[in-house]
């Protein structure tokens, strides 16, 4: 089944800005997150949304996607728990240079130490876990050197021999006719797969590979203030190096589960709090939830719906450096839908005492609305 266009998945245009991409992702992820949406297919929809955001939120991946579209999973845009990083490279150009120049100067020693592959792990965090951080233990499937043969691939007591086909070089010369004449092309030796070694008696544990897949438990300290889509490198926790080379690294990518009440923008938090029209008119003090605990907020008399109050220092700790963001409280005045006769009479009496007048600010709003209708 063909993948949908990432821009279509997020419901945005191809010219969308980074902020528009982020807003679209937050809206959709909140709508389809499996912890919130229990409908059939919500989980797959959420994965599709997350994949689209992972690519389009990264300028380099987005540019590659805009140019080439969906590519083979082994050649980029990798992801998922424990999934490795890989790149497409320039193999096509290398083949051309190999053909005309015989691959001269690019041959590498097959026995030289090489760094192991990097790994990627996706960690899902609750909203408050991302705000305050946490200590976590994760399990990573990765390739490690075989303990039985110590990575040689040979049966204990034996050693790998030099490949008899390539002489230990890991490559062989192949003559090829081209429009420019006969050239010599270097190809990876198919008998030793480029290792330059030949194993007569293979290790019974790894079957000659020298590596086995193991599940490793790793402790990860999630820093306070981490945001959705950010990643953290755990040095040396990738796959084992080859020929004594260093291990690769592990990259932990954070996916923050949207909260049903708190909304985050950078290190600030936004919430909507309902108040009654009586509280808005006469003023009051209300309790407002924050990630740091309950806070008492004074509502001045005459507060209008949409008014925003700032609670300083009640947001998200800065990931780099000291300080904390703020929480913005947006009040929504709730008008009662059902009133009994006595309540209606009280309101009518109130209206008669005011003469149905509106204050200057409200008058100004209606004047602007009238001018808009007239086209002034």
UniProtKB/Swiss-Prot annotation:
Zn(2+) 1 binds at residues 146, 149, 203, 206. GO terms for biological process: chaperone cofactor-dependent protein refolding; DNA replication; protein refolding; response to heat. It comes from the Bacteria. Zn(2+) 2 binds at residues 163, 166, 189, 192. SUPFAM superfamilies: Chaperone J-domain, DnaJ/Hsp40 cysteine-rich domain, HSP40/DnaJ peptide-binding domain. Binds 2 Zn(2+) ions per monomer. CXXCXGXG motif repeats lie at residues 146-153, 163-170, 189-196, 203-210. Keywords: Chaperone, Cytoplasm, DNA replication, Metal-binding, Repeat, Stress response, Zinc, Zinc-finger. It is found in: Cytoplasm. GO terms for cellular component: cytoplasm. GO terms for molecular function: ATP binding; heat shock protein binding; unfolded protein binding; zinc ion binding. Its cofactor is Zn(2+). Pfam families: DnaJ, DnaJ_C, DnaJ_CXXCXGXG. Residues 5-69 form the J domain. Participates actively in the response to hyperosmotic and heat shock by preventing the aggregation of stress-denatured proteins and by disaggregating proteins, also in an autonomous, DnaK-independent fashion. Unfolded proteins bind initially to DnaJ; upon interaction with the DnaJ-bound protein, DnaK hydrolyzes its bound ATP, resulting in the formation of a stable complex. GrpE releases ADP from DnaK; ATP binding to DnaK triggers the release of the substrate protein, thus completing the reaction cycle. Belongs to the DnaJ family. HAMAP family: DnaJ. Homodimer. The J domain is necessary and sufficient to stimulate DnaK ATPase activity. Zinc center 1 plays an important role in the autonomous, DnaK-independent chaperone activity of DnaJ. Zinc center 2 is essential for interaction with DnaK and for DnaJ activity. This is Chaperone protein DnaJ. It comes from Listeria welshimeri serovar 6b (strain ATCC 35897 / DSM 20650 / CCUG 15529 / CIP 8149 / NCTC 11857 / SLCC 5334 / V8).
């Amino acid at each position: 089944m063909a993948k949908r266009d990432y821009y279509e998945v997020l419901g945005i245009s191809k010219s969308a800005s980074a902020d528009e991409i982020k807003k679209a992702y937050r809206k959709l992820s909140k709508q389809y997150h499996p912890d919130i949406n229990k409908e059939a297919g919500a989980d797959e929809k959420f994965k599709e949304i997350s994949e689209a955001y992972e690519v389009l939120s990264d300028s380099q991946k987005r540019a590659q996607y805009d140019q080439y579209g969906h590519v083979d999973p082994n050649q980029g845009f990798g992801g998922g728990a424990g999934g490795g990083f890989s790149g497409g490279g320039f193999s096509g150009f290398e083949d051309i240079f190999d053909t005309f120049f015989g691959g001269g100067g690019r041959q590498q020693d097959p026995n030289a130490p090489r760094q192991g592959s990097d790994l990627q792990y996706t960690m899902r965090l609750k909203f408050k876990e991302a705000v305050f951080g946490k200590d976590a233990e994760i399990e990573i499937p990765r390739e490690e050197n075989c303990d039985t043969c110590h990575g040689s691939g040979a049966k204990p007591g034996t050693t790998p021999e030099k490949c008899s086909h390539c002489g230990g070089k890991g490559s062989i010369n192949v003559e090829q006719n081209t429009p420019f004449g006969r050239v010599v092309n270097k190809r990876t030796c198919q008998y030793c797969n480029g290792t330059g070694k030949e194993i007569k008696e293979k290790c019974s544990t790894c079957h000659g590979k020298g590596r086995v897949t193991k599940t490793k438990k790793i402790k990860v300290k999630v820093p306070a203030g981490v945001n959705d889509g950010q990643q953290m490198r755990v040095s040396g926790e990738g796959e084992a190096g080859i020929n004594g080379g260093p291990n690769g690294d592990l990259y932990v990518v954070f996916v923050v589960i949207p909260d049903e009440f708190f909304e985050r923008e950078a290190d600030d938090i936004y919430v909507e709090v309902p108040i009654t029209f009586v509280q808005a008119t006469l003023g009051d003090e209300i309790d407002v939830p924050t990630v740091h605990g309950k806070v008492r907020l004074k509502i001045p008399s005459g507060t209008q719906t949409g008014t925003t109050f700032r609670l300083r220092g009640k947001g998200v700790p800065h990931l780099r450096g000291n300080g904390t963001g703020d929480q913005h409280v947006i009040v929504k005045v709730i008008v009662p839908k059902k009133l009994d006769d006595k309540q209606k009479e009280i309101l009518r009496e109130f209206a008669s005492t005011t003469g149905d007048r509106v204050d200057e600010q409200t008058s100004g709003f209606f004047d602007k609305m009238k001018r808009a209708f007239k086209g002034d």
